Amino acid sequence: MRLPAQLLGLLMLWVSGSSGDIVMTQSPLSLPVTPGEPASISCRSSQSLLHSNGYNYLDWYLQKPGQSPQLLIYLGSNRASGVPDRFSGSGSGTDFTLKISRVEAEDVGVYYCMQALQTP
């Protein structure tokens, strides 16, 4: 059974900073999925998000229909409290991936990656 809603969204985000704008690009634009199957979303930053402290300042959010965005992954690979272990984040520098090991119907929504290295 295919899930009837769009799983993914594309986000391009510009944030001003002293070293120039950081542009975040996600792919794919949308991804039809089947419950029980894996899914993967890619995110690329125009600048490295790896801080001198060794952390990647990249967060993943899920916005379910009719709800506010909820934090899934912070600092590139850390699951937020209450997030199922089927969600995992990986990557470093400019290239990151969110993986869902086994998609469930409740996972439908729009997924966003967000850099947290620069703030307005």
Swiss-Prot record:
Cellular compartment(s): Secreted; Cell membrane
Taxonomy, superkingdom: Eukaryota
Region Complementarity-determining-1, residue ranges: 44-59
Disulfide pattern: C43-C113
A single GO BP: immune response
Location of region: Framework-3: 82-113
Coiled-coil segments on the chain, per record: none
PROSITE patterns in the cross-refs: IG_LIKE
Region Framework-1, residue ranges: 21-43
Annotated region (Framework-2), positions in chain: 60-74
Domain named Ig-like: residues: 20-120
InterPro entries in alphabetical order: Ig-like_dom, Ig-like_dom_sf, Ig-like_fold, Ig_V-set, IgV_Light_Chain
Region (Complementarity-determining-2): 75-81
GO molecular function annotation: antigen binding
Region annotation (Complementarity-determining-3) ranges: 114-120
Subunit structure of this chain's protein: Immunoglobulins are composed of two identical heavy chains and two identical light chains; disulfide-linked.
Function field: V region of the variable domain of immunoglobulin light chains that participates in the antigen recognition. Immunoglobulins, also known as antibodies, are membrane-bound or secreted glycoproteins produced by B lymphocytes. In the recognition phase of humoral immunity, the membrane-bound immunoglobulins serve as receptors which, upon binding of a specific antigen, trigger the clonal expansion and differentiation of B lymphocytes into immunoglobulins-secreting plasma cells.
PANTHER family xref list: IMMUNOGLOBULIN LIGHT CHAIN
Name of the protein this chain belongs to: Immunoglobulin kappa variable 2D-28
